[in-house]
Amino acid sequence: MRSLAFLICSATLFAADYDVLIRHARVIDGAGNPWMRADVAIKDARIVAVGRIPAAATATRVIDARERVLAPGFIDVHTHVEDDIEKNPRAGNFLLDGVTTVITGNCGSSELNLSAWFDKLAKVGLGINVGSLVGHNTVRREVMGAADRQATPAEIARMQALVDRAMRDGAMGFSTGLEYVPGIYSNTDEVIALAKSAAAHGGV
């Protein structure tokens, strides 16, 4: 029992300071500052230190990033990954370009039921962060099909309800694609009304 207690204590005493320690990187912080030479320490999946970290510091994994750039993950704000992200959830194509967050639902086309879609994505093990806009063409098609006419007040109200639901389900804003069917048949008043529904939730 004493031997077991000693082993447990020893493991605690000699545990690494960090999970990952990146040394000598050219750090660009994304705030517009000039790059700086620095070390970056990560523990429990969080950055816990940036700067000159003592040489005696230990880590489970040490990376020498000399002459390499270390920056926050890039955000690709214009993607159409609705189908692809389910087939390729690790998204290595984005990660190899330094992209760690994508925004989809652009050009007026998105998933209609974002709550169900987000739940599905949560189960597949995503390699990147995914956010979505709610698409004008999507909600118009749900209410009016491909009708080549202006929406009635009642139809606009139904579309507003869909936008409102999407925003409550986690949409980041509202997108349009007015050169595509059926959005091409809408007028300015319709677009403004739906944009206001998104804006009421702080959406873009």
Regions found by a protein language model. Name each.
Residues I192:
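Glycine-rich ThDP/TPP pyrophosphate-binding loop and its adjacent helix/strand module
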Residues G30, C107, E179:
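Flexible loop residues that form catalytic
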Residues S110-E111, T176-T188:
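Glycine-rich, proline-tolerant flexible connector loops at the mouths of alpha/beta enzymes
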Residues A65-L70, F74-I75, T79, E86-T176, ...:
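Divalent-metal coordination cores built from histidine and acidic residues
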Residues D17-Y18, V27-G73:
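Histidine-rich, glycine-flanked metal-binding segment
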Residues L7-A15:
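Hydrophobic h-region of N-terminal signal peptides that target proteins for export
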